């Protein structure tokens, strides 16, 4: 169910006697998102899931909401892939958060969507923050690299519905690295088959199990391109395994979900590869042991087991 930032509705008139917005009762939505789902045969499992998770009243509210609605086939695939015989086997807390991972505040028509990140109503287990969702519109519309829009722009009085062909499970930091083409070189580095460290396995660890949660300072493709020029080499294959392993560890903080607001000037940040220094005056930066400075260019991409900040220069040991 969808993306973007959760908004808080506030009264526009503090002087009203009844405390309701605009000085009077709000007319209930008459053709809600729930009404639309209830009237669609291929969304019957979604409706049952909303009932089990006690989200019917939420999505019958004023909104507006954007809902990514998985089809019955999508739900059946999700249940089979995760070893559940039926919807009743899914723990309520998990099901609720997965459903909220398909909901974004606001009415986002397909023409409003752009490639990038938005914020869902799902809450990360690594922090009190709502989780991000990655939208890619380069070839249709896809969410987190796994779920595509099959039918768009079904309008409701309290928002809009897009039917999707797969349940969007709760993302980990690897999910976003793989889904976002900005990090394709990073993914190629993390998955090089000669590495001693299984970075994908480590960074897929769920919160509650060491060494999660994680903070990942993720170099963009351009950052890796600049590194190759700096080192006068042709590609990642020219970096020996011990060096690449050490470089990648320098971008991972284990055991902490560090927001950009947690960074301060001259803050020592301990990564798996050693200490780096954060500064925030004039813009957030990271300085490695050689004095090389990397700018943090995108912040707070929140996953279920940690957080990602994009950087414009690779951090060296």
Task: Spell out what each predicted region is.
Residues 6, 12-317:
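Mature, structured domains of secreted/extracytosolic soluble proteins
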């Amino acid at each position: 169910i969808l993306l973007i930032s959760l908004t808080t509705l506030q009264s526009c008139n503090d002087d009203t006697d009844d405390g309701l917005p605009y000085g009077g009762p709000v007319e209930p939505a008459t053709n809600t998102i729930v009404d639309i789902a209830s009237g669609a045969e291929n969304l019957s499992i979604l409706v049952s899931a909303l009932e089990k998770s006690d989200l019917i009243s939420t999505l019958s509210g004023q909104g507006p909401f954007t809902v990514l609605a998985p089809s019955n086939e999508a739900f059946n695939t999700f249940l089979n892939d995760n070893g559940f015989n039926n919807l009743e086997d899914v723990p309520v807390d998990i099901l609720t958060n997965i459903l909220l991972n398909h909901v974004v505040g606001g009415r986002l028509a397909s023409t409003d969507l752009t490639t990038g990140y938005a914020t869902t109503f799902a809450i990360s287990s690594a922090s009190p923050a709502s989780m991000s969702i990655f939208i890619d519109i380069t070839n249709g519309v896809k969410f987190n690299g796994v779920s595509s829009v099959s039918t768009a722009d079904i309008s409701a009085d309290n928002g809009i519905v897009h039917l999707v062909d797969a349940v969007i499970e709760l993302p980990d930091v690897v999910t976003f690295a793989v889904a976002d083409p900005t990090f394709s070189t990073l993914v190629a580095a993390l998955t090089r088959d000669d590495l001693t460290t299984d970075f994908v396995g480590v960074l897929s660890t769920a919160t509650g199990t060491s060494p999660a949660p994680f903070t990942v300072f993720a170099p963009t493709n351009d950052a890796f391109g600049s590194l190759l020029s700096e080192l006068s080499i042709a590609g990642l294959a020219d970096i020996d395994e011990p060096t690449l392993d050490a470089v990648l560890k320098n971008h991972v903080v284990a055991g902490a979900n560090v927001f950009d607001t947690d960074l301060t000037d001259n803050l020592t940040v301990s990564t798996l590869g050693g200490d780096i220094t954060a500064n925030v005056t004039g813009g957030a930066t990271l300085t490695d042991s050689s004095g090389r400075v990397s700018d943090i260019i995108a912040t707070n991409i929140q996953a279920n087991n940690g957080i990602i900040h994009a950087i414009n220069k690779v951090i060296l040991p």
